[in-house]
């Protein structure tokens, strides 16, 4: 399911076509494992160079979770009408229930999040409190902004807040872990290390292959 959504998103973005290589398929397997295993950390960090599929993958994950949630609703309706699940369906249903209570993921760039903190506090708070949030392009935003003369750190504050509640968060970034530590500090780096599973995107940019 995830691979299908990823292929569609690649085609929609006109990024040179889907590269069906081992590196891409390995990442798809790792992310599928994060989605299906109950033993993984609640959040996910997708990091690596520019233009190698991180944002596209984040959108594919969001589409996959939407589909899983819709499937969970259909199963609930079937059970209400007396349908008995097969052993295979019961196993799948455990996965569906994991995401069945989550709303559609909110997807926002880190730069937009920083802008909201300064110009639209109400929306900023709502986004920060979302049950499932995808922050795209961490590191492209100003680390701190001034709101009525008060200096705030919008993305750092969101990461702290979501760490405290262990809310599901996906972050994409061109920064490596050392860069994250240097830019945001050790406390943010430690929280990401503790609460996020990490998947590196190491291929060259797809944008140069058009």
Stretches found by the model and what they are:
Residues 69-80:
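Internal, charge-rich low-complexity segments
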Residues 1-40, 198-199, 203-210:
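A short, basic N-terminal segment
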Residues 82-87, 94-163:
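Conserved nucleotide-sensing/catalytic segment adjacent to the nucleotide-binding pocket
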Residues 56-70, 85-92:
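P-loop NTPase Walker A phosphate-binding motif
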Residues 43-45, 132, 168-170:
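Residue-level preference for the first positions of well-ordered beta-strands
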Residues 41-58:
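Walker A/P-loop nucleotide-binding motif
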């Amino acid at each position: 399911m995830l691979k299908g959504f990823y292929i569609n998103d690649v085609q929609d973005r006109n990024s040179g076509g889907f590269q069906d290589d081992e590196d891409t398929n390995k990442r798809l397997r790792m992310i599928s494992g994060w989605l299906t295993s109950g033993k993984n950390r609640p959040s996910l960090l997708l990091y690596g160079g520019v233009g190698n599929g991180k944002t596209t993958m984040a959108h594919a994950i969001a589409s996959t979770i939407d589909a899983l949630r819709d499937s969970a609703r259909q199963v609930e309706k079937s059970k209400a009408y007396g349908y008995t699940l097969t052993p295979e369906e019961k196993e799948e249903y455990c996965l569906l229930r994991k995401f069945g209570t989550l709303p559609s993921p909110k997807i926002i760039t880190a730069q937009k999040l920083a802008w909201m903190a300064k110009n639209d506090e109400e929306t900023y708070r709502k986004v920060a409190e979302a049950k499932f949030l995808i922050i795209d392009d961490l590191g492209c935003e100003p680390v701190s902004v001034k709101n009525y003369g008060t200096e705030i750190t919008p993305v750092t504050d969101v990461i702290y807040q979501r760490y405290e509640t262990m809310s599901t968060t996906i972050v994409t970034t061109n920064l490596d872990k050392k860069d994250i530590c240097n830019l945001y500090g050790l406390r943010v780096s430690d929280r990401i290390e503790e609460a996020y599973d990490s998947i590196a995107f190491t291929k060259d940019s797809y944008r140069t292959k058009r």
